[in-house]
Design a protein with these regions (language model features):
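Proline-centered turn/helix-capping motifs that create local helix->coil transitions or kinks
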Residues: 8, 185-186, 329-331
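Carbohydrate-associated surface elements
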Residues: 86
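Active-site core segments that coordinate phosphate-bearing ligands/cofactors
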Residues: 90, 95-110, 118-152, 164-175, ...
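Short, basic and Ser/Thr-rich N-terminal targeting/leader segments
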Residues: 1, 55, 62-64, 116, ...
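N-terminal glycine/serine-rich phosphate-binding loop of ATP-dependent small-molecule kinases
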Residues: 1-79, 105, 132, 179, ...
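A conserved helix-loop-beta module that forms one wall/lid of the active-site cleft
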Residues: 178-196
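Short clusters of small/polar residues that mark proteolytic maturation junctions
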Residues: 15-16, 82, 243, 266
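Short beta-strand-loop/turn "lid" adjacent to the catalytic site in phosphate-handling enzymes
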Residues: 29, 51-83, 109-114, 144-168, ...
Length: 433
């Protein structure tokens, strides 16, 4: 819940509830969630705030990007949520190459597994789409439909771009390229570049949903150029706001608003690398002692010691960890690695520090690509995500590697904050329904 005061936003109340919506599946690569359960929880949360704060006039929306749900002609959800983590696009097809590779070869378009359009193409080929489905959208766009009674999705360009096959320069889907791989335009949702009104819910205006990346940036850093946002949670991401459109291997130009772009680099593992390390040590402790307790406090102590010890070593004697344990968006088959192992650095402290450093270096390499290609001079660096808030050593490593002071975002729920403020960007109350 945000209260807008001039150009500032004051956080009145934040509320977090468990998602717990993943559906069991026989396929390790399949990551799907119960869409209706998500919608019910979101509605209950919204109703709570509207009951508590009846003065609310507008409702802004955001949610997880890239994933899709299918809807029927009445605007009802008829499928699970296929999430951004879904791996069907990386599976070998009959021609022994993955769908992602085929898209690159046939369409010269780079799209990762988990992107909505990749998921849709796979589902279409494998007859996995419900017969009554007439289109698809993100889960937050469906929530907007649910609240306002819309029968057809209207999605902001920030979400459309997350599907893949989207021309960020001209703010439209690449219909010619989609045609090369057999996708008809009838499946595509309507796209808008500016905030629009979807309709109303309980007499409040509901605005178009925005991507969680854009919402997080807006909530944490505002809309100033030359600002770098570093987010580390289960994943890892850097975002720089720019007037320039710039896209390279591993770097996306995601639509923002007012003609700006978020230049984004994302690591697939990110904070998960640290979680894997904690899980590794926890299994060892459980095997030795029978105890199964979180070890993040101990890891922080070891990371601190590892950092101090590492500072006194020669560069060629420092243990190095590459944390691409889940591959990269550009190359899903890339593996992680541990190098520069010597007898004197074969320690849990060095491993712990090495994982944290590896997480940061992967993001820093992406930042270097952006800086070299755009000549952007970053003057402010904002940090967000629990991976940073709960790990002072990681924050120090980021400052040292990037060479910029790190300021933690004022509010923890950056995406929700940005979504709430985004509703104030609506310039017209004309119905788009």
């Amino acid at each position: 819940m945000e209260h807008n005061i001039g150009n500032n936003a004051e956080l009145i109340e934040a509320k977090t509830i468990a998602n717990d919506s993943f559906l069991p599946t026989a396929n390790d690569w399949e990551k799907i969630q119960d869409a209706e359960q998500i919608i019910k929880k979101a509605k209950d949360l919204l109703d709570y705030f509207l009951d508590q704060y009846p003065e609310v006039k507008r409702i802004g929306l955001t949610g997880q990007m890239h994933g899709i749900v299918y809807v029927d002609k009445a605007g009802r959800c008829v499928s699970p949520l296929y999430t951004w983590q879904d791996g069907r696009g990386s599976l070998p097809e009959d021609n022994s190459i993955s769908l992602v590779e085929e898209i690159q070869q046939k369409c010269q378009v780079k799209a990762a597994s988990g992107y909505g359009m990749v998921t849709h193409i796979y589902n279409l080929r494998h007859y996995l789409i419900p017969d009554v489905a007439v289109g698809f959208c993100t889960i937050m766009d469906y929530f907007g439909m649910y609240l306002t009674g819309r029968k057809r999705a209207l999605i902001h360009a920030s979400n459309a771009a997350g599907f893949g096959f989207f021309d960020g320069r001209h703010m439209c889907f690449m219909k010619e390229e989609l045609g090369k791989i057999g996708i008809q335009g009838k499946w595509l949702p309507e796209v808008c570049g500016a905030m629009q009104e979807l309709g109303t819910y309980r007499n409040r205006i509901v605005t178009t949903a925005i991507g969680d990346n854009q919402a997080s940036f807006f909530g944490a850093a505002g809309n100033e150029n030359s600002t770098l946002l570093v987010n580390i949670g289960t994943g890892g991401q850097i975002s720089v706001l720019s007037d320039q459109y710039f896209a390279e291997d591993g770097i996306e130009a995601r639509p923002f608003w007012d003609g700006k772009y978020l230049l984004v680099g994302a690591s697939l593992c990110g904070g998960k690398a640290y979680a894997l390390l904690e899980e590794f040590f926890r299994k060892l402790i459980k095997q030795a002692t029978g105890q199964d307790k979180p070890l993040y406090g101990i890891l922080e102590t070891m990371a601190r010691k590892g950092k101090e010890t590492n500072a006194s070593r020669l560069e060629n004697r420092k243990l190095k960890v590459t944390t691409t344990f889940n591959g990269t968006r550009a190359n899903p088959e890339t593996s992680g690695s541990i190098t520069n192992l010597f007898a004197d650095n074969f320690t849990p402290e060095a491993f712990t520090y090495g994982v944290l450093e590896g997480m940061v270096l992967e993001l820093y390499q992406m930042y270097q690509i952006i800086r070299t290609g755009t000549y952007i001079q970053v003057t402010r660096m904002i940090g967000s995500g629990n991976g940073l808030r709960k790990n002072p050593v990681l924050c120090e490593i980021i400052e040292e590697i990037f060479g910029i002071k790190l300021i933690l975002a004022e509010y923890e729920e950056e995406a929700a904050t940005g979504a709430a403020i985004s509703s104030t960007l609506l310039k017209s109350i004309e119905r788009t329904k």
